[in-house]
Each structure stands twice: as structure tokens, then as C-alpha cells.
Amino acid sequence: MTVAVCLQAPTIFERRVIADATAVPIGTIMKLEDANTVVVSAASADPFGGIAWEEHTASEGITEMTVAMNGRWQIVTTAAAIPVGNSVSIGGADTCRLSTEADTIVGTRFGKCLNEIGGGGGTAIVEVGQLI
């Protein structure tokens, strides 16, 4: 699994609830589920719940974790093109894709792509938390 790589440290963090049995590596893109609860993102159009800032080891009795809500990250993209400066959304497990209008409504937009991504996909530099 390829996770997001931090290029510029975030300054905004949230504490989220997570199931004790879930193992999460640092840099995993998280899906916001319910009442401040996150799970590992696995599908396109998942609502953004942050990027894992700490490892969560399964079955240690810990049910909270810290996620980053901003910063600059290197994130693998889906196979679609992303023009520089466009917003990105969750594209699946630890990937991003070009945002659509519908993504604004459901809360999947999470950042701005700072480099041009061609039609075959690639690795985006994403300013997380920056949408304008």
C-alpha cells in the first residue's frame, strides 16, 4: 500500500475515534464516518477525515488517533489527468483524483494539486486543506 508522504509539516490536527482492531500506517488517507469516527479510506468519493499523523496499532486498547488536516503531501493519483491548481478528492485507497461539483456537496474535496498530472496518472503534490 502506498501512503501519502509528508513534504511540509501540517499545523492543524484533529483527534478522531477509530476502532481498536484497525491497523493504520502513518500517511494513510482516512474516511470520516460518523461522530468524529474514521476508518481507512477505500473508495472514491469517501468524505475526507484527515491523514494519519501517527501509526495506530491494532488491538492495543487505543480508540483514538491524530490526523493531519493540512500540510503539503505527495499522494498517488488515479489514472485520470489533474490540471495544476485544481482541487482533488479521495480517489480510492490512499489515492486522489480530480474533484467534481458533486464532491463539494459530499465533502470529499480535501486539497489543491500543485503539479500537472497527465492522463496516465502519477504522483501529485497536494496542498491539503487549501481549496482556493
Task: Identify the role of each PLM range.
Residues 1-132:
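Surface-exposed, low-hydrophobicity beta-strand/loop segments enriched in small/polar/acidic residues
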